[in-house]
């Protein structure tokens, strides 16, 4: 059985993440990790805060803190809110860790040993008024490709093209707003991606099973021709350009570029996870010469991160010529937008994870964000659509079914699994239907089709309601108690089954349902044999009735949240 390594794109340290960040990487990765664990696979889900680069320095300055203190505090906050959302990371690390310092410096040396690192005198944007170079996000201006007026110095958020600060039209300093900008010489290290063009293309070619979104972005950059990328920056905060603790001459005041060290943190975070635990070995997950051959590595990220993960990081891994495990499946997502525009951390636009939990339980958000996963195209959050998904799917379908059958059982069968009767034609039809739908759900989950998986899960919930409505135990109990017992026993088993298969999506509610049956959680994933799965509860087993699982969202609440967070604009 394959071991499953899962990473989700590292959330930036500059504040609590918004729902778009959650929907496009961390949440689907968690759903998949929970599913694979339930199937019995040895699964490792790794994530970390991305703590270097200009976003960290700018956010720390705005908060009036030194950057190290700011990052330490924000890491704790992001970890806490992620756990509150049910994100089941095996480890949530920090890209500023000593492990990542050592490993990033190691990769640079390995690449240089193979002729893929070159020192170049570069022309970089310099702010005369700020008396400093302006790397990456310290400078903004007009994108030369799409003319977006707030493009950053590393990437345009509008068209997605990777940029250098000198590419920008009419640049200005993010620090001061000054347009008193010059271009000056500065020395930097470059990763010679041009030498890796054929090797990276062959690597991408070998992954024909990647989703079209990931492949199309990868080939766009390959077809345009790879360029050599600067991997150092004129910044104070970051990983020093050094080897064995000795600064590289001429680079004493420079650090590695955040997009060089951030993906390496996937490996370094696994080292963090393993450190101090003799039973954990990071190498068996990452080194093919140390047992990682049976690992299936799946990455989750938004589409704006794909270029770095299909070009720059592979250039690092492949260029080192060391036996590192590379990604098998790259699952990319489009954007979850906020009504007609984008969520924005810097502009505080949209609902953020901490605020979301202030108003509603995590499962409601988890369900909406997976059922409306932005896989095939960008999707837009609206309060009305959110309320509809919660009320229709969770309250009316799953919650209604569980509540009805458990209360009926408590009323008519003393709250225990009833004995009596044998399954009839209606149950046989149900067994066949549920078996087929379980197979479909597992197939969609294995394919990492998040939205289709949610649809398949909801379809299984609907089957239970339809069965209960057609079987009508409230009518059967009046004339045939054994027949009513069969119906109730079958429906109770369905509810227990729902707890197991819903857990990757709505783990808190699933555990509440499981607790009503005395099930151990997390539970194993069921087989596709519904006849067997719907006969697992022993006769006489006590069943309790939980509190209402899902409260409906009312129009008054929508109005209140629209006033607080915004809406149609």
From Swiss-Prot:
Show where the record puts the motif 'HIGH' region.
11-21
What is one process in the GO biological process aspect for this record? Answer: methionyl-tRNA aminoacylation
Residues holding ATP: 345
Q: Name one GO cellular component term.
A: cytosol
Describe the protein's quaternary organization and the partners it interacts with. Monomer.
Quote the function comment for this protein: Is required not only for elongation of protein synthesis but also for the initiation of all mRNA translation through initiator tRNA(fMet) aminoacylation.
- Keyword Flavoprotein in annotation: no
Task: State the protein's name.
Answer: Methionine--tRNA ligase
User: Which cofactors does this gene product need?
Assistant: Zn(2+)
- InterPro entries, from UniProt? Anticodon_Met (IPR041872), Met-tRNA_ligase_1 (IPR023458), Met-tRNA_synth (IPR014758), Methionyl/Leucyl_tRNA_Synth (IPR015413), MetRS_core (IPR033911), MetRS_Zn (IPR029038), Rossmann-like_a/b/a_fold (IPR014729), tRNAsynth_Ia_anticodon-bd (IPR009080)
The cellular location(s) given in this protein's UniProt record come to: Cytoplasm
- Return the cofactor note field: Binds 1 zinc ion per subunit.
Listed binding positions for Zn(2+) are 143, 146, 156, 159
Protein family: Belongs to the class-I aminoacyl-tRNA synthetase family. MetG type 1 subfamily.
Molecular-function GO terms, alphabetical: ATP binding; metal ion binding; methionine-tRNA ligase activity
Which gene is the coding source of this polypeptide chain? metG
- This protein's superkingdom? Bacteria
The EC code for this enzyme is 6.1.1.10
Q: Which reaction does it catalyse?
A: tRNA(Met) + L-methionine + ATP = L-methionyl-tRNA(Met) + AMP + diphosphate
Does the keyword Amino-acid biosynthesis feature in the UniProt annotation? no
Which EC class, in a word? ligase
UniProt keywords, alphabetically: Aminoacyl-tRNA synthetase, ATP-binding, Cytoplasm, Ligase, Metal-binding, Nucleotide-binding, Protein biosynthesis, Zinc
Q: Where is this motif: 'KMSKS' region?
A: 342-346
Q: Which residues form a coiled coil?
A: none
Q: Which HAMAP family match?
A: Met_tRNA_synth_type1 (MF_00098)
